[in-house]
Amino acid sequence: MKKWLVVFFLSASALANPQQELNQRLGMNDGFSANFNQTVTSPEGEVVMEGEGSVDIARPSLFRWSTSLPDENLLVSDGKTLWYYSPFIEQVSIYWQEQAVQQTPFVLLTRNQSSDWENYQITQDGNVFTLVPKAADSTQGQFQIDIDAKGIVHGFNVIEQDGQKGIFKFTDMKLGKPAAARFTFNIPEGVEVDDQRN
């Protein structure tokens, strides 16, 4: 009986299409915290930038992305509003999170909504899922998510239309929903505010 169940579940898993499989894997964990390393390469493969920082994600739609190198930047979403803070230029820009979804597929990792995935052609190669926008007039390139069968995201790649590639690798992964306070942002005194919500 046990062998039959194992075969059944393996067969059912094999029948899932890449979109369903990605959706299922992302739904396995409700959040995580990690450090990340970032490498940006030119279309010719030369390293043009390296960076590092930390990330907190809680589903649905909460995230905190903090870059410490090469420049300090902070991106925080409470599920509705997105704040982008750059201490160097002493400015915070404010957006609706819906605006961010249209600009960066990274936000898709935090939402995992079927309606979002329908905008992409999704293919799977092992644990790497590649998303290509379906819209012919899209300015987005490809987005690749490295997520294992236990739902642990190991990293992602952003491949621009010109061939430039951003590679993000997660380390020191801690599964579980981070504290709610990680997803709030208080505007520091004296900084310029650029409110893009319309």
Swiss-Prot record:
The keyword Membrane does not apply. It is found in: Periplasm. The keyword GTP-binding does not apply. One of its GO terms (cellular component) is outer membrane-bounded periplasmic space. InterPro entries: LolA/LolB/LppX, OM_lipoprot_carrier_LolA-like, OM_lipoprot_carrier_LolA_Pbac. One of its GO terms (biological process) is lipoprotein localization to outer membrane. Residues 1-16 form the signal peptide. Keywords: Chaperone, Periplasm, Protein transport, Signal, Transport. Its main location: periplasm. Participates in the translocation of lipoproteins from the inner membrane to the outer membrane. Only forms a complex with a lipoprotein if the residue after the N-terminal Cys is not an aspartate (The Asp acts as a targeting signal to indicate that the lipoprotein should stay in the inner membrane). Monomer. Belongs to the LolA family. This is Outer-membrane lipoprotein carrier protein.
